[in-house]
């Protein structure tokens, strides 16, 4: 593992996340925060993610064809999850006919003063994505 640069390994995991593995979004977000100066603890976390990948090689995205498009979305946030900055991480996931079509996990730009405010900020980001996906789906259907 010493021959593989930390940033390259995180980048490879990020590629998997973007292409086929939304379950890696939170882990990539945390690992990438320490890319400039990883310590042994960060390497251990990276190895843990790689072991997870090894044990879940058959996981991936699955799409089904259906007559009507059904878009379902989920959003969540952790209030003040970053101990140093007290900023929250919010995320969302959207499924179209059961298959993931959009997902994101991102540290919020502002500090939420309550868990309710935190959840509303996450919901706002998810709603913007839902509107875009709805318009896109309608245009695709013609």
Curated annotation (Swiss-Prot):
Organism: Plasmopara viticola (Downy mildew of grapevine)
Encoding gene per record: RXLR161
Keywords carried by this UniProt record: Host nucleus, Secreted, Signal, Virulence
Cysteines joined through disulfide linkages: none
Protein name according to UniProt: Secreted RxLR effector protein 161
Main location (coarse class): secreted
Record bears the keyword Glycosyltransferase: no
Entry's family note: Belongs to the RxLR effector family.
Domain notes: Has the canonical translocation RxLR motif, but lacks the canonical EER motif, which characterizes most oomycete effectors identified so far.
Protein role: Secreted effector that completely suppresses the host cell death induced by cell death-inducing proteins.
Location of the protein in the cell: Secreted; Host chloroplast envelope; Host nucleus
Region forming the signal peptide: 1-27
Lineage, broadest ranks: Eukaryota, Sar, Stramenopiles, Oomycota, Peronosporales
Positions occupied by motif RxLR: 48-51
Keyword Zinc-finger belongs to the record: no
GO CC annotation terms, alphabetical: extracellular region; host cell nucleus
